[in-house]
Design a protein with these regions (language model features):
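Short acidic-hydrophobic, aromatic-tinged amphipathic segments that line or gate anion-handling sites
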Residues: 558-573
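Active-site-adjacent beta-strand anchor residues
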Residues: 145, 539-540, 564
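Phosphate- and divalent-cation-binding pockets in alpha/beta enzyme and binding domains
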Residues: 294, 298, 545-549, 573
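Alpha-helical elements of the RecA-like P-loop NTPase motor core of helicases
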Residues: 233, 371, 547-548, 572
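Transmembrane helical cores of multi-pass ion-transport proteins
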Residues: 1-454, 468, 522, 554
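Intrinsically disordered or compositionally simple regulatory linkers and C-terminal tails
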Residues: 1-9, 574-584
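The feature marks cytosolic C-terminal regulatory regions of anion transporters and related permeases
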Residues: 388-558, 583
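Generic hydrophobic alpha-helical segments
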Residues: 179, 488-492, 570, 574
Length: 584
């Protein structure tokens, strides 16, 4: 009966809030409260802007920034991760939902809610079954390339709001063509508002805080005011539109935003909708998880804390389900907000819950004031935010380090820009998996020899070493499994056919952590064929777990040679000269 009752440690592992709440005190409350104020100030305009990017009503951005933050505070393990709407996921949402319904319709909003629910379920299932390791198969350079291209697409897609024109498109060519075709319809007042806001926000990022500090202002207050730059832009441009009736001059505004707390919403369970959204939900889940965990791990390392990736899946899954049930759309951990949260002094996930309270108050009290907010201001907020995502230096870095990685990154960027975000992210995931399979299917194999005067064996192409014509010593620098077993077979056969004096082949297995069934069958075949050539097969430096598995098969009994503890032992046994020299 006791086995059915989880221990306190097990409960705390699945409910991290029970861990950090035990040491919560007034000082921690103060730190979390200050961080929440700063992040709330930053999140209000961002949530409105990202809803615009997703093609959704502004209030859905606010809704996606309330209950999801509370859910993450309960289930998440990062002390500083700030969950909410983010640019890339908003773009992916627009791409997925835009194929099913027209923007501004109830069907479009319902599809976005359903997408959040599906993403949450996928993340939860991955967390329950501890599938977080699957994210390791995604190449970070490839994902960086996708995010860079997405940043370019996002910024380009918002130019229509800066110019005050109509423009459509799912890729860079379509967007630019549509923009150029409608430039004659540019609204000059909108353009002035948009450009001025972009310039102001870029200056706020780098110049406002130093300027405030130069006046003698306290660093903490200067930091808060600098983070409030986007809010200042919202206030000033909204007042300008209201005072001068600029909406009557063609400046497009947000319009009526319903006030109140998020309503309880129910996602669609229509099988047709689920089948259409499944791939998008899966990709959003994976991309969101990879970026979220990357940010969380980086920030946790700075305070010598740790996160649990599988529990992060649960936390993000709960956040997305909470978003769906409260009228929001897919969310994940935001890089910029998380860094701000960390720098502002957040000590626990409670900072996120306090931020949710701030957003809820904004949804209750401030939404009537957003009626005259220009869409150009929100577009400027998005453009400035996503420019930090654009990093084309990944191309030069991969070119210098690995041409294969460069080709994958370039293909991902190119296809994302030319074909759109859905093709781009699918390509990125596929290329990541192909890169992994390509690299592991062609493991590095080095022929090794004895370094004179030592017991060390090194690559004959890199060091001056001693070898023996009767012995072919090979070091395998990869685990052996179905994808690379044939490569090893071909390598050995090519060498022994070309080098007739060989009587012994020694496989140095110091880097082999695993041998699967396919690789075992290949070793058995190598052993059999070499025996037919009068050549003995030996193993050296086999790790314990690998040896345990080999012992459960008939391979060791059929092995024509021996298993040596070290490569030096093999050299002593197989080359009498080494034993006579007694090198050490």
């Amino acid at each position: 009966m006791n086995r059915l009752i989880p221990s306190r440690a097990q409960v705390e592992r699945h409910l991290p809030i029970l861990q950090w709440s035990k040491t919560y005190n007034r000082a921690t409350l103060t730190s979390d409260g200050v961080a929440a104020i700063i992040v709330t100030i930053m999140l209000i305009p961002q949530s409105l802007a990202y809803a615009l990017l997703a093609g959704l009503p502004a209030q859905m951005g606010l809704y996606a920034s309330i209950l999801p933050l509370v859910a993450y505070a309960i289930f998440g393990t990062s002390r500083a991760l700030a969950v909410g709407p983010v640019a890339v996921v908003s773009l992916m949402t627009a791409a997925a939902v835009g194929n099913m319904a027209l923007q501004g319709t109830a069907e479009y909003a319902l599809a976005a809610v359903t997408l959040a629910f599906m993403s949450g379920v996928i993340l939860l299932v991955m967390g329950v079954f501890r599938l977080g390791f699957l994210a390791n198969f995604l190449s970070h350079p490839v994902i960086a390339g996708f995010i860079t291209a997405s940043g370019v697409l996002i910024a380009t897609s918002q130019l229509k709001h800066i110019f005050g024109i109509e423009a459509q498109g799912h890729n860079l060519i379509q967007l630019l063509s549509s923009l150029v075709g409608h430039l004659a319809q540019t609204n000059i007042i909108t353009l002035v508002i948009g450009v001025a806001t972009v310039v102001f926000l870029f200056w706020v990022r780098k110049g406002l805080k130093p300027a405030l500090l130069a006046t003698g202002m306290a660093p903490r207050l200067a930091d808060i005011l600098a983070k409030a730059g986007p809010v200042g832009a919202v206030v000033v441009t909204t007042l300008a539109v209201w005072l001068f009736n600029l909406d009557e001059a063609g400046v497009k505004i947000v319009g009526a935003v319903p006030s109140g707390l998020p309503p309880l919403t129910v996602p669609s369970f229509d099988p047709d909708i689920w089948s259409q959204l499944f791939v998008a939900a899966l990709l959003i889940s994976v991309i969101g998880f990879v970026e979220s965990v990357s940010v969380a791990q980086t920030l946790a390392a700075k305070k010598r804390q740790r996160i649990v990736p599988d529990q992060e899946l649960v936390g993000l899954g709960a956040s997305n389900i909470a978003a769906a049930l409260s009228g929001g759309y897919p969310v994940t951990g935001g890089f910029a907000r998380s860094v701000v949260n960390f720098d502002a002094g957040a000590e626990t996930p409670a900072a996120g819950a306090f931020t949710a309270i701030g957003i809820a108050l904004a949804a209750l009290l401030l939404t009537p004031l957003l009626f005259f907010l220009p869409k150009a201001t929100l577009a400027a907020t998005i453009i400035v935010a996503v420019m930090s995502l654009v990093d084309f230096s990944i191309l030069t870095k991969t070119w210098a380090y690995s041409k294969v990685d460069f080709a994958a990154v370039f293909a991902t960027i190119f296809l994302t820009l030319i074909s759109g975000v859905e093709v781009g992210v699918s390509t990125g995931v596929a290329l990541s998996i192909l890169l992994f399979l390509y690299k592991t299917s062609r493991p590095h194999i080095a022929e090794v020899g004895l370094v004179p005067g030592t017991q060390h064996f090194r690559n004959i192409k890199r060091h001056t070493v001693e070898t023996h014509p009767d012995v072919l010593a090979i070091r395998i620098d990869e685990s052996l499994y179905f994808a690379n077993a044939r490569f090893l077979e071909d390598y050995i056969y090519d060498r022994v056919v070309c080098d007739q004096p060989i009587k012994h082949v020694v496989l140095m297995c110091s880097a082999v952590n695993e041998i699967d069934m396919s690789a075992l069958e290949s070793l058995e075949e190598i052993n059999h064929r070499l025996n037919g050539m009068g050549i003995a097969l030996h193993l050296s430096e086999v790790k314990g777990p690998v040896m345990d598995k080999l012992a459960r098969s008939p391979f060791l009994k059929e092995l024509t040679g021996q298993v040596f503890l070290s490569q030096y032992d093999a050299a002593v046994a197989l080359t009498p000269k080494t034993a006579a020299d007694g090198t050490a």
